[in-house]
């Protein structure tokens, strides 16, 4: 139906007859001349129909051209000419096609929005097929496609094997709710959609495949937000006989190469490394945005002699923290704006936010200054590095809570005061705690997942004794404040895996029921192994320059977990429910 793509017509084709096919991007009738911008996936070219240059037998051509509407689907035959008025805004702007034939392949109904408009997200998602025609959406989808292609090429070149793992699998606790699928042939039993291929890729290492990868679809029934979907895509990888550094060095090279190939982005030759403990202390986050040159400063020693109760209580508590955050030029904040910052940090657990403003004149305004001697308060501000025109915020309380809300404040201040530099700052975060203590459940939970190996502990009794302080062999790759990949060295000894299950409150019977197949596999000569999984959606969004992963997913769900285009989820007939042995009941509000 076509000989060339619209966006690839250029000066080398002048004088040649071409056949094109695409959509009517714009159609303009200027009296005796019609100009049509014809669009396909490669771009736009101008089609010209001049009634004055057409003999009487071809007057039908002008009639067709003058009656075109947005998004009509056309086949056009014509001759390539040099344009009199060059359009430097498009790559075909030096040429045009003088049409000799136009065939309407399909008329478009009146549009809910035009391809060059940017309507509300609900409308975009309802008419996703129109939304995806927009040049910006085409660009973002192509970025994703190029990313996946580049990753595959790199892994294939290095001997990795692309192996599929099951979509219908067993429900296992991995941190989020499972999506369950009734098993028609086994009444009362259910499959689960995989939250990740974690256990299968470990079993592939036991099976001797050594280097595995998969572009894997994963499913988690959890609350949605801009960077989270019910179904998402991972680059899943696993290696046998590796250390943490082996995995990290390989994927560093891969990410550097792929970012340069896909988007021309140059990343650091070596990614810096930081322990989880240091990241939380300095930045209040296990995925710090290193583009923001602000750090939390511990000031417990300098406030211990004050009479400000929130500070002294935190200092006295073994798990307390008093941290300060200096914001350059922040003294411009009004009292109302400071209150808004306090309300913002309250969402992250803050019960109050103290501050000190240093006016350009040197005058200090602070509601907590009265709880210090003049010299002590001056020494505190000097230690923090506060200068004229700055504001300093203080947080006090439980160490983890203070880290969380002061870390959130750091990010907000970075955005509000334009302190985020326009570069790319990758980082490895390592040495995560093996476990967290869940006060509500009164038990340990795994910080990464239950299959992560402990660091520097080979003895089970030692792990039991030091569970609260044990570190894991987990690692995350962080880029500009986004965790783009997470992995670990796995447990490969069955007795250690049983001990970890026990510490997590998983009984032996429960472990057999849920993970018996893994424990059995580890019994038969499992090699040391480890790996990592990268979030394709998140990386594509970063490269494409969008804050929402919905923009790089062709058919995403809304934050209400719906597909507005297909109207999913939708009711199922009683007949279908009966076939899968499911009975539903209405819940009273």
Curated annotation (Swiss-Prot):
EC number: 6.1.1.12
One annotated GO molecular function: nucleic acid binding
Sequence positions that bind ATP: 220-222, 229, 483, 535-538
GO cellular component terms given for this protein: cytoplasm
Keyword Disulfide bond: no
Enzyme class: ligase
Function: Catalyzes the attachment of L-aspartate to tRNA(Asp) in a two-step reaction: L-aspartate is first activated by ATP to form Asp-AMP and then transferred to the acceptor end of tRNA(Asp).
Quaternary data: Homodimer.
Protein's UniProt name: Aspartate--tRNA ligase
Gene coding for it: aspS
